[in-house]
C-alpha cells in the first residue's frame, strides 16, 4: 500500500486563516502550494478534455449526413473535418467513425487527467520542491520561470508540428481551393519562403490587405506552421539554456499574479485574432463546414440572381440597375469587373466557387456566359440563404431582411464567443496586472473588510 504524502486529507493550507484568501478566491489559496496548484491545473485540463470528448460524441450522435454541418449547429466536427478526417470531395461527410474515435480518446484522456488532478489535490505532496525538486519552483526565481516558459514554447511548437505532419505525411487536410469544389489533399510543397510568410504580419489589417487573416491557400498555412514550430522550439531551447537579461529582470514584474496577467493577455490576443479569422477567412475555416462568410453570402446572392436572369435572357454585361450602375456587373474602384448591386461593397471577396470565373481583369464575361458549372450554382444558392447573420444585410449592426429560418451559423457563434471571451480575458489581464504592479510597488491596498458598505446595510427581510 502506498504511503500518503499527507497523513490527513483535510483542507489545511486552503482556508482564509492560513492563506489570506477565502474560498471564493479559488486557486489563489494555492499560490504557495505548488503540488496542490498542479492538481488544480491537471483537474482543469481534465474538465476541458472531458467537455471536448463528450461534446464530440454528442455532435456525432446528432449528426445528419444529408445536411451540411453548418446547418446543424456543430462546432467541433467542422474542425475535425478540416483536418481531412471523414470527408471527401466537396466536403461531403463519408464516414463519422473517425469523429467517434476522437471523442472516445478525449473521454479516456479526461479520465486519466481527472485521476491525476485528484491525486495531486488530495494525496500528492503539497509542495513539489521537497519531493520533486525538478518540478518545484519559486515565483520569484527568474531563471526557473524562464525555463518553464521555454518548456511551454517547445510544447506549442510541437503542437504546430503535429498539424504539419498531418498535412504532409498522414493523409493530408481538407483544401477548400482544390479543383471542383474542394477535397482532401496532401500538402507536399508548403511555403517556406520567409518573405512570403512574414509579409502577412507586415500587411495592413484594414480593407483588402487583411493582415494574417488574408491567407488564402493551404501551402502558406502549413508553411506558416513550420515557421511557427521552428521559432517556438528554438525560442524554448533559448529560454531553457539562458538566464533573463538584466533589462528584463528590471522591467518585468516577477510574481505569480504577474504571470497570470501575462497569460491572460496572450489568451485575449489569441481570442481576438481567432474572432477575425473565423469571421473572414474561408481557407482555414472552409465554408463547406462553417458556413459562408458574410461577404461570401452576399456575393452568392448576386451570383444566383445573375445565373437565373441570364437563363431568362438578360444581357448581364450591359443591364442597368435603378441607380444607373450595372445591375449585375460593374467596375470596382480599381477597374475590375465585379458584381453589381448592394454586394459591390464586397467586391474584393475571394471564394473557391467564384474564382474560376475570374480573368485578368476581374470577372470574365465569357466565362460567366459559358463556363458556370452546376456545383457553383448549387453552392451559391446554398450560401445565399445561410449568411452568418441570418441575413445578407444589416443596418446599424441589426440584421435586416432575414432570409433563413432557425439558423445560427457556426461562424457567428465561434467568432462572437471568441470575441466575448477575449474581451473578458483582457479585462482580467488589466485587473491582475494592476494588482501585480501594485504589490510589486508596495502600495497594494485591497478592500477594507471591516468597513465594507454591506455591513451597515439593513437585512433584506
Curated annotation (Swiss-Prot):
Propeptide section residues: 1-2
Principal localisation: plastid
GO BP terms in the entry: photosynthetic electron transport in photosystem II
Subcellular location field: Plastid, Cyanelle thylakoid membrane
Transmembrane regions: 57-81, 122-143, 166-188, 243-263, 279-300, 435-459
Cofactor, free-text remark: Binds multiple chlorophylls and provides some of the ligands for the Ca-4Mn-5O cluster of the oxygen-evolving complex. It may also provide a ligand for a Cl- that is required for oxygen evolution. PSII binds additional chlorophylls, carotenoids and specific lipids.
Residue ranges the record marks as coiled coil: none
Pfam families membership: PSII
Gene Ontology, cellular component aspect: cyanelle thylakoid membrane; photosystem II
Annotated keywords: Acetylation, Chlorophyll, Chromophore, Cyanelle, Manganese, Membrane, Metal-binding, Phosphoprotein, Photosynthesis, Photosystem II, Plastid, Thylakoid, Transmembrane, Transmembrane helix
Phosphothreonine modification, residue list: 3
A GO MF term: metal ion binding
Residues reported to bind [CaMn4O5] cluster: 355
InterPro entries tied to this protein: PS_antenna-like, PS_II_antenna-like_sf, PSII_PsbC, PSII_PsbC_sf
Membrane association type: Multi-pass membrane protein
Residue list for modification N-acetylthreonine: 3
Function recorded in the entry: One of the components of the core complex of photosystem II (PSII). It binds chlorophyll and helps catalyze the primary light-induced photochemical processes of PSII. PSII is a light-driven water:plastoquinone oxidoreductase, using light energy to abstract electrons from H(2)O, generating O(2) and a proton gradient subsequently used for ATP formation.
Subunit structure, interactors included: PSII is composed of 1 copy each of membrane proteins PsbA, PsbB, PsbC, PsbD, PsbE, PsbF, PsbH, PsbI, PsbJ, PsbK, PsbL, PsbM, PsbT, PsbX, PsbY, PsbZ, Psb30/Ycf12, at least 3 peripheral proteins of the oxygen-evolving complex and a large number of cofactors. It forms dimeric complexes.
HAMAP family from the UniProt entry: PSII_PsbC_CP43 (MF_01496)
Family: Belongs to the PsbB/PsbC family. PsbC subfamily.
Protein name, UniProt field: Photosystem II CP43 reaction center protein
Naturally occurring in which organism (per UniProt): Cyanophora paradoxa
Amino acid at each position: 500500500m502506498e504511503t500518503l504524502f499527507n497523513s490527513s486529507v483535510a483542507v489545511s493550507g486552503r482556508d482564509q486563516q492560513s492563506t489570506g484568501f477565502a474560498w471564493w478566491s479559488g486557486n489563489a489559496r494555492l499560490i504557495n502550494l505548488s503540488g496542490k496548484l498542479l492538481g488544480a491545473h491537471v483537474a482543469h485540463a481534465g474538465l476541458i478534455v472531458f467537455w471536448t470528448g463528450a461534446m464530440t460524441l454528442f455532435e456525432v450522435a446528432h449528426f445528419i449526413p444529408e445536411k451540411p454541418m453548418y446547418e446543424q449547429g456543430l462546432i467541433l466536427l467542422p474542425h475535425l473535418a478540416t483536418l481531412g478526417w471523414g470527408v471527401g470531395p466537396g466536403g461531403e461527410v463519408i464516414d463519422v467513425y473517425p469523429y467517434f474515435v476522437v471523442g472516445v480518446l478525449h473521454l479516456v484522456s479526461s479520465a486519466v487527467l481527472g485521476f491525476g488532478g485528484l491525486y495531486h489535490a488530495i494525496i500528492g505532496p503539497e509542495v513539489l520542491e521537497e519531493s520533486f525538486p525538478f518540478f518545484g519552483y519559486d515565483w520569484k526565481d527568474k531563471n526557473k520561470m524562464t525555463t518553464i516558459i521555454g518548456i511551454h514554447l517547445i510544447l506549442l511548437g510541437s503542437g504546430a508540428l503535429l498539424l504539419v505532419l498531418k498535412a504532409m505525411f498522414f493523409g493530408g487536410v481538407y483544401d477548400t481551393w482544390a479543383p471542383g469544389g474542394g477535397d482532401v489533399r496532401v500538402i507536399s510543397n508548403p511555403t517556406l519562403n520567409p518573405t512570403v510568410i512574414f509579409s502577412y504580419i507586415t500587411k495592413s489589417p484594414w480593407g483588402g490587405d487583411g493582415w494574417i487573416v488574408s491567407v488564402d491557400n493551404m501551402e502558406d498555412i502549413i508553411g506558416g506552421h513550420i515557421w511557427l514550430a521552428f521559432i517556438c522550439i528554438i525560442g524554448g531551447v533559448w529560454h531553457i539554456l539562458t538566464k533573463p537579461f538584466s533589462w528584463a529582470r528590471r522591467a518585468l514584474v516577477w510574481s505569480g499574479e504577474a504571470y497570470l496577467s501575462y497569460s491572460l493577455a496572450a489568451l485575449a490576443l489569441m481570442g481576438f485574432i481567432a474572432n477575425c479569422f473565423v469571421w473572414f477567412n474561408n481557407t482555414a475555416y472552409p465554408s463547406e463546414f462553417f458556413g459562408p462568410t458574410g461577404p461570401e453570402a452576399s456575393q452568392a446572392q448576386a451570383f444566383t440572381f445573375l445565373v437565373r436572369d441570364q437563363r431568362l435572357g438578360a444581357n448581364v454585361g450591359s443591364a442597368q440597375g435603378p441607380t444607373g450602375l450595372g445591375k449585375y456587373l460593374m467596375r470596382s474602384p480599381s477597374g475590375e469587373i465585379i458584381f453589381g448591386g448592394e454586394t459591390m461593397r464586397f467586391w474584393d471577396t475571394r471564394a473557391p466557387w467564384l474564382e474560376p470565373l475570374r480573368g485578368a481583369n476581374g470577372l470574365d464575361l465569357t466565362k460567366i456566359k459559358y463556363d458556370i458549372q452546376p456545383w457553383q450554382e448549387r453552392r451559391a444558392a446554398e450560401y445565399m440563404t445561410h449568411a452568418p447573420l441570418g441575413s445578407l444585410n444589416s443596418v446599424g449592426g441589426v440584421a435586416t431582411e432575414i432570409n433563413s429560418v432557425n439558423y445560427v451559423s457556426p461562424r457567428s457563434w465561434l467568432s462572437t464567443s471568441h470575441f466575448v471571451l477575449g474581451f473578458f480575458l483582457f479585462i482580467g489581464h488589466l485587473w491582475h496586472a494592476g494588482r501585480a504592479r501594485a504589490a510589486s510597488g508596495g502600495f497594494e491596498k485591497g478592500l477594507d473588510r471591516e468597513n465594507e458598505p454591506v455591513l451597515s446595510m439593513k437585512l433584506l427581510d
